[in-house]
Design a protein with these regions (language model features):
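Compositionally biased terminal segments of proteins
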Residues: 1-26, 30-153
């Protein structure tokens, strides 16, 4: 584990906990930090079904102001023709590799199950696993007539 990168992640998450609106931490770092503690994950993935560019810009502005890190937009696109995604690169003094932050439109959950850890909104472990299965299989979960979650696609 890169201790400087972890320190930067935790600083961004601390700032995020004070400013988060509709976005919540998801992905590998959410699993690693708050649930499994299984491996070091290097990026921060923030998901929201609302995906507001204004909110993203305010969060990034807050990250810059409070952390002092240089943050630049790397790319902005629609993944798979569905989910909007914005990738940012955070330059950390003394590190060769940057911290990567992405903001992703959640096209799987309209109302994700969000937990809070020290104020940080984090997707539930069930939601995280369904996202991983969806990403791996290329299918999407839907609820059938009697409330079971099934995959289609």
């Amino acid at each position: 584990m890169d201790k400087k990168l972890r320190k930067a992640q935790l600083e961004i998450l601390r700032i995020f906990s004070l400013r988060a609106g509709s976005f919540a931490l998801a992905g590998g770092t959410a699993l690693e930090l708050y649930y499994l503690h299984h491996r070091f994950s290097v990026d921060l993935d923030f998901f929201s079904p609302e995906y507001s560019l204004d909110e993203i810009e305010e969060l990034v502005k807050g990250f810059r102001k409070s952390s002092g890190y240089k943050i630049r937009l790397e790319s902005d696109f629609k993944a798979g023709g569905k989910a909007r995604v914005r990738f940012y690169i955070v330059s950390i003094p003394g590190l060769d590799r940057p911290l990567k932050i992405d903001f992703v439109e959640d096209v799987i959950f309209n109302s994700p199950d969000i937990r809070r850890f020290k104020g940080v909104p984090v997707y539930s472990v069930d939601n995280l696993y369904l996202q991983k299965i969806t990403a791996i299989t290329g299918t999407s979960p839907v609820e059938d007539d009697i409330g079971r979650v099934v995959f289609q696609g």
